Amino acid sequence: MEEKKVNIRIASPEDAEKLLAIYAPYVEHTAITFEYEVPSLLEFRERICHVLEKYPYLAAEVDGQITGYAYVGVFHDREAYDWCVETSIYVDQSCRKMGIGGKLHHALEEVLKLQGILNLNACIAYPEEEDEYLTKNSVEFHRHLGYDMVGEFHNCGYKFDRWYHMVWMEKMIGEHRSGQDFPKNFPQIREEAESILSKL
């Protein structure tokens, strides 16, 4: 079977309905996210707008249809953490095993390098034993992308009447040095980011 091309572009608030349709099953049927209730369309649109003020929010398309998305958020509020972000990737559950998540992450990483981000951090739900709500696949996915496990919190997430662990994984994408320039906000490098995404 011919592999379909995955196009990565910058998401917009107008994509909120389609992106929310991808996210909702993760809330309702998995422990991949510890969120209990599916956010409203308005709230989800506001989340996209908030991210884009500072960071990239990317959408993957196959044959013109959105099949996944990726974005980052603030790791911690204090200024000394500005070079660190927390990553999130969600792929339409009917489109898994197509390499979409990996391509989204690669694109995200390239844009974050433009901004001057150095540390990628992933907060991942992790089961003691795999069940119908949560597997260990996300940890393996991140290992494949070059992340290392750096911490584990035990029984800190309660969903579907079960307790789950949470792990932190990290990946360094830049050089840590003295005299470090502060990262740029996404709008400052958006045009350059669009150029890079068009070539991926």
Language model segments and positions:
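Conserved acetyl-CoA-binding loop-helix of GNAT-fold acetyltransferases
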Residues: 97-113, 135-140
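A short beta-loop-alpha structural element at the N-terminal edge
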Residues: 7-19
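Conserved GNAT acetyl-CoA-binding A-motif
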Residues: 112-134
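A short, internal acetyl-CoA/4′-phosphopantetheine-binding micro-motif in the GNAT/acyltransferase core
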Residues: 88-96, 124-129
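Conserved GNAT-fold acetyl-CoA-binding loop/helix
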Residues: 20, 24-47
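Acetyl-CoA-dependent GNAT
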Residues: 39-84, 88-94, 115, 172-175
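Glycine-rich phosphate/pyrophosphate-binding loop shared by adenosine-nucleotide-utilizing enzymes
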Residues: 6, 65-69, 164
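Conserved catalytic-core motifs of GNAT/GCN5-like acyltransferases
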Residues: 123-125, 139, 143-162, 174-175, ...
